[in-house]
Amino acid sequence: MKIVMMPAKFLRLLFIFLLLSNFSASAQKTTIWIVGHAEKVTNIKQDEDPALSAAGTKRAEALAKELKGEHIKAIYVTKYKRTGLTARPLAYKAKILPRVYVDTALNVFAKTIIKNFRGENVLVIGHSNTVMKLLEAFGADVPFPSSLDEEDYDMLFKVTIKDNGKRELAIDYYGEKHHTNEIPEKYQPEINHPEAVRPFTNY
């Protein structure tokens, strides 16, 4: 039987390729996108589950456009209609079936996401009174003392989890202007990553 010997140069190149591949895989970042639901219908009874208003439907489309190139692998929503409708345009375009999470056990939820989607991008849609809790659960900074104002509809939070466990938080506006609070300067994209600044078309 004839034995074929591989040239030493080829073996060295193969070794380098495998080494770089392993390094790349181990150095992957996990990105969690967190956003509150879009504008809801307000002229209903307090105990009802409102849908999105016309402005909210437009914002849901803006969210899909904003995250179009981010390769979202999973989308999580609460049991309320307004979060599912906020996710719908992106879910449809990305061919993802949103999953429902329980927002009363956020620490467990966050640990599960980090474990199951290492190196991937995940979108989590919450509410004005849970967005800060979600950030805390994922180990990120909490930029506002307690919760978002109910009128803070246009903020998109990006939590980057590095392979060494370090977290980075960046906040951006998206869609039509609709907020009460202003993004703290230290979390603005141009402060964290000046090379990635893009014009705010709606501001």
What are these regions, as identified by a protein language model?
Residues G165-R167:
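Short helix-loop capping/hinge motifs at secondary-structure junctions, enriched
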Residues M1-K29:
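Bacterial Sec-dependent N-terminal signal peptides
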Residues S128:
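Long, charged/polar, surface-exposed segments that mediate recognition or autoinhibition
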